[in-house]
Curated annotation (Swiss-Prot):
Gene Ontology terms, MF aspect: 4 iron, 4 sulfur cluster binding; 4-hydroxy-3-methylbut-2-en-1-yl diphosphate synthase activity (ferredoxin); iron ion binding
Pathway: Isoprenoid biosynthesis; isopentenyl diphosphate biosynthesis via DXP pathway; isopentenyl diphosphate from 1-deoxy-D-xylulose 5-phosphate: step 5/6
EC number(s) on file: 1.17.7.1
Keywords on record: 4Fe-4S, Iron, Iron-sulfur, Isoprene biosynthesis, Metal-binding, Oxidoreductase
Pfam families (UniProt xref): GcpE
UniProt remark on cofactor binding: Binds 1 [4Fe-4S] cluster.
Protein name: 4-hydroxy-3-methylbut-2-en-1-yl diphosphate synthase (ferredoxin)
Length: 408
């Protein structure tokens, strides 16, 4: 069950300035996706997407369940045909029967009106791509778009989009207007260029159609595979919406980020930059790996920024010549023994220089002060000094004595 975040502030002594170090999030409207709410001050929602063929009903059910069990709160499924839309209905029912209801987003692309109308009957949210929903084959001989041609296609988009908007509106369901930098419509490219501005205008065109039909259960995304483009597009989208009095939540992601360490760094560079600006209400880290590997990255980003706390926060120095014990080995032992104690802050410091001061905000500290011995702290208070080989054991005993231990 989701809960509203509790604002926290950091304070200094009475004669010093008080600084609020919490991120001020952009105010957005709440958008319900099943039993999950995006925006409206609710915690940033974690999403992913299965990579099974939707026609494989059992495989898709298993994949959705695997993601949900490790913390994925909304799961996206590709729906490239009517047959896939019908299969998704069965997937949804089988999930409810064999596991539990999970909020699902149907991903619809090329000329997807009929598919979207079918799948909207069965799931909570439909994602459409403005560049592909009404797909116009590029004309290699074209040199410009006249205003009349631009508006003519705009009317065609409205005619095609309106039935889906009305269906979602009447059922109380949601839509993501998911713009991708790599698939802008030809008329947008001619008019605005291959730019963040073109991405924003593409989204605004669809938003205005939705608003004209009194539908506002909308989430927006502005994804790109290059971080500077992605960041610029989201910032511009947030500014334009603020200027226009719009308050739609934003779904953040770097599309096609790749794999391994660099894929994680690339996604974090884009997503965390925007979240630190207060922009973003739901995130997906897109990796060329098993979808399950995306979820820990999402939660790590949110924890590092102080937006959600779902694991133990470890504070540890990088080690140097002053370190009085094998810091890497001890940190591993401490982590393996305490990683289930969600909500605690635990510091492991190699010497007195980086000890009490750097770990002042931690609940518990493990500090090397004397060769062969470890000093254990509760907050800023040194509790006891113990032999190094008993350090981890005594840290656990201290946590237990405070009533903050739970068995894994």
């Amino acid at each position: 069950m989701q809960t509203l975040p509790t604002p926290t502030t950091s304070s200094n002594t009475a004669n010093q300035a008080t600084f609020d170090t919490t991120i001020k999030r952009r105010k957005t409207r709440p958008v319900k996706v099943g039993n999950v709410t995006i925006g409206g001050g609710y915690p940033v929602v974690v999403q992913s997407m299965i990579n099974e063929d939707t026609l494989d009903i059992d495989g898709s059910v298993a994949a959705i369940r695997r993601l949900h069990e490790i913390g994925c709160e909304i799961v996206r499924v590709t729906v490239p045909s009517i047959a896939h839309a019908v299969a998704l209905a069965e997937i949804k029912q089988k999930l409810i029967k064999t596991y539990q209801d999970v909020p699902i987003v149907a991903d619809v692309h090329h000329n997807g009106m009929k598919i979207a109308l079918e799948v909207a009957k069965h799931i909570e949210k439909v994602r459409i791509n403005p560049g592909l929903y009404v797909f116009e084959k590029p004309n290699t001989n074209r040199t410009e778009y006249t205003q009349a041609e631009f508006e003519e296609i705009g009317e065609k988009i409205r005619e095609t989009l309106a039935p889906l908007v009305i269906t979602l509106r009447d059922q109380g369901k949601a839509m993501r207007i998911g713009v991708n930098h790599g698939s802008l419509a030809e008329r947008m490219l001619f008019t605005y260029g291959d730019t963040p501005e073109g991405m924003v205008e593409s989204a605004l065109e669809f938003i205005r159609i939705c608003e004209s039909l009194d539908f506002r259960n909308i989430v927006i995304s502005m994804k790109a595979s290059r971080v500077p483009v992605m960041v610029a597009a989201y910032r511009l989208m947030a500014k334009r919406m603020d200027d226009l009095g719009m308050d739609y939540p934003l779904h953040l992601g770097v599309t096609e980020a790749g794999d391994g360490e660099y894929g994680r760094i690339k996604s974090t560079a884009g997503i965390a930059t925007l979240l630190a600006d207060g922009i973003g209400d739901t995130i997906r880290v897109s990796l060329t790996e098993a979808p399950e590997k995306e979820i820990p990255v999402c939660y790590s980003i949110l924890q590092a920024l102080g937006l959600r706390k779902t694991m133990v926060e470890y504070v540890a120095c990088p080690s140097c010549g002053r370190t009085l014990f094998n810091l890497e080995e001890v940190l591993h032992k401490v982590r393996e023994s305490t990683k289930h104690l969600t909500g605690l802050d635990i510091a492991v410091m190699g010497c007195i220089v980086n000890g009490p001061g750097e770990m002042a905000d931690a609940d518990y500290g493990y500090v090397g002060k004397t060769p062969g011995y470890i000093s254990l702290y509760r907050g800023r208070e040194e509790i006891k000094k113990v032999p190094e080989d008993k350090g981890v054991e005594e840290l656990i005993n201290l946590i237990k004595a405070d009533g903050r231990w739970v068995d894994p």
